[in-house]
Amino acid sequence: MEKAKKIIIPVVIALLLIGIGAGGYFFYESANYYKTDNASVSAHMVNIVPMVSGTVSSWGIEEGDKVNQGQILGNLDVFSMVSSSKVDQTALENSANSILAKAEIKAPINGEIVQTNVIKGVTVALGSTMAVVADTSDMFIKANIEETNIFKIKPEQKVSIKIDAYPGKTFAGYVESVAPATQNAFSQFSSLNTSGTYSKVTQMIPVRISIINDESLPMLIGMNATIKISIK
């Protein structure tokens, strides 16, 4: 019996110490850091939209192409659509130069084409998205923070970043900005419920985090990330 006590007591003490240590570590981490895996690599993206409706007569870009602001990416044939319609032909001829200028599809920013939705011969409508260009020279992390924790997050706080594509690698960064509205604030569907029942959902606020990529490791928009923000 005495021998059993000599074995059990040290084991119990060891387990207690482990529990205390784990609890202390958890308390320290929660008091000093905010961590989430609701984050991903992102970049400033702009939709490329036509200023007039027409048929795509030329389209010379593909996903992955680098483009410069103002570069002509394609052209629309707009006259074939209006010549047969009830349009004053004299007015059409007088405004030909203006229409031709609008028929040129130009890159709105410097960047990389990350999506293209059209091919030569298709008809596109005014304001429709023909392609998306991203400024991949300034990649950042977009994290979604719960409204219950958002007031812990402030610009300039240091951040440790892990990208799933690079296991074992930790990137440094800092909080650049906190969005002034929740993700759903500008949803086309109202969050108001008129049926008499309502389920409250925790809202998420987008936070932009810079990432220091000294090794210039390749990163793709949408790659999963885990971030740890120093809140003290």
Regions found by a protein language model. Give the residues of each.
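Hydrophobic alpha-helix/coiled-coil detector that fires on Leu/Ile/Phe-packed helical surfaces
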Residues: 22-34, 50, 137-138, 144-151, ...
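Short histidine-centered loop motifs in beta-beta connectors
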Residues: 51, 57-61, 65-66, 115-118, ...
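Surface-exposed strand-loop junctions at beta-sheet edges and helix termini
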Residues: 61-62, 67-68, 99, 108, ...
